[in-house]
Amino acid sequence: MNVVFECSMPRTGSQLIKSVLKQNPDFAIQIDSPLHFKWHKFRKEISLEPTCSTLTKEELSNRMRGFWLEGLKGWGKAINPKAKVFIEHNRFWADDIDIIKHFFNCKIIIILRDLKDVANSLENIVKNHNEFNNDFNNFYVYKNSAQLQRTHKFFEHEMIRIPLTAIKRIIDEGMFDFVHFLKYEDFIKKPQQELDKLYKFLELKPYKHDFNNIKDMDRIDTPMLPYGRHSIVSSLNKHKKTNFTLKEDVIEFLETEFKWYYERFYNE
């Protein structure tokens, strides 16, 4: 079994795409994983472990790698014992792309979406389901609209900031040999063709998916976070574009602040 890391921004359609991929018995797929946080805790604690001082750097690195890779594979096999690929998902793995490449020697999948649609999706959730939210209100700056201030807050939040800065670094440093970008918009238009590209990247044989019979993955949404509200369509034919509510000042901010993103992925 190979381990592949998926660390996309929220509201990019990654849950929909993984729900489709789960049709393929070659995959072990789950929702958000707790393993990234355990990895960081493990690294912190092992650095304080005195018995590790008896090992050389190479010995300790090899044992850590073996322990964690087998642990990740074991987690995946518990999901699907016959799987060839385990997709380990947590947005914050984007903070560890060097670890993934040089230590785990694994590949990364990142789902992309127009940032205006990401912001629009969050805006609609926050405005329509604000009863449990207090992170994205209480703005009192007169020169900027409330919507623009909310958008600033969205993109300052770690859930977006960490994956997005990782994407910029991948572009700046040309780290495309182990990263596959899949655009949500392309998937909606040509789903099988886009997944065929993914299979080629993962060195798997193509699989014919049923895009009219999509079953949602088991998951528990949290009412406390706008990022975790999912409504997966059962068929791509039923896919509807979200009502667009962003104002011109927000659109200008996103297209200016993230010009590099649009030039690389949406320069059409």
Regions found by a protein language model. Give the residues of each.
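PAPS-dependent sulfotransferase catalytic core
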Residues: M1-G74, E131-K153, F211-W260
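Short His-Asn-centered micro-motif
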Residues: C7-S8, I87-R91, L112-R113, Y184
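Short catalytic/ligand-binding loop motif for oxyanion handling, primarily in non-cytosolic enzymes
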Residues: T12-K18, H36-W39, A94-I97, K116-S121, ...
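PAPS/PAP-binding and catalytic site of the sulfotransferase fold
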Residues: G13-F27, I100-F103, F181-P206
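Glycine-rich phosphate-binding loop used to anchor ATP phosphates in small-molecule kinases
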Residues: W68-D98
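PAPS-dependent sulfotransferase catalytic domain
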Residues: W68-W75, N120-F201, F258
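Conserved phosphate-donor/acceptor-positioning beta-strand/loop module used by diverse small-molecule
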Residues: H89, I100-N124
